Amino acid sequence: MMKKTIAMLALGTAMVFAGAAGAAEIEVKMLNKGEKGMMVFEPDFVRAAPGDTIHFVPVDKGHNVESIQGMIPEGAQPFKGKFSEELTVKLDKEGVYGVKCLP
């Protein structure tokens, strides 16, 4: 039986609304084992601006990513990816986003 582990990824926004022209795409890997331990996101902290996209990649199968209820900015859309599938999320609200891998 796999231990249920919650990994946190804070997507802090320090810049004013950046607009699509300067938008960046940031890749976050979902791993069984990484530099900081087991069942992790790498990187585990990302600084992004509104308009940026975060691309979650399940390097090891069996992972997903989903926002944590109550841990995303007010007015931001919650998101949930399928197991073993990539998910791209465009950030439209400034704030901190908490995410987890369900298994």
Please place each PLM-identified region on the residue numbering:
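Bacterial N-terminal signal peptides that target proteins for export
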Residues: 1-9
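Extracytoplasmic copper-binding redox domains, predominantly the cupredoxin/blue-copper superfamily
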Residues: 19-103
